[in-house]
């Protein structure tokens, strides 16, 4: 049986994304650009589902519990002419927790915790922010989510969970994924053949 195909969308931009603040588990709303990105991702997804012969009415849709992911999901589903709120929530898709660094820019985090910041710079996958979690921990919960999929799925979540999924599926290494930019307004397709990005 082939591995499930995941159509993965990162949430649209927020005010904190725009100014480089670490969001983590904070619930920051989409900004105007973020709304447009979400609708665009829905349009891109519609084309991909048509290309792949998938019935949008039969595919499961699942989102992170954070508001920016849920708002993006509802805009995506609206673009697909589906009931906006008819989707599942899975806590394993929540963003990496940055603990005490949430709300800070990277420069502010470095000024506050220079020693830990330096260690994390060297090993971003395994070193967590104070009171936060490591990418390795995120990878464990995202891997658990993926193993439980019964079939092809549309997921809306975060940059951190995308990186963790890419490593879980063997498409990236922890070193390559740690600094990988995950685009907003795009659809990433993960399948047996690898990963592709569609904008």
Regions found by a protein language model. Give the residues of each.
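Generic beta-sheet signal
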Residues: 6, 59, 148-160
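Active-site-proximal alpha-helix that buttresses catalytic centers in soluble enzyme cores
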Residues: 7, 13-82, 112, 133
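Short active-site segment of divalent metal-dependent hydrolases/proteases
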Residues: 14, 161-162
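Short, well-ordered beta-to-alpha junction loops that form the rim of enzyme active sites
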Residues: 63-66, 92, 157-160
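Active-site signature of alpha/beta-hydrolase-fold catalytic machinery across serine-
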Residues: 75, 164-168
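Phosphate-handling substructures
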Residues: 78-141, 191, 199
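Domain-level recognition of soluble alpha/beta enzyme cores
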Residues: 136, 172-198
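Alpha-helix C-terminal capping segments
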Residues: 143-151, 190
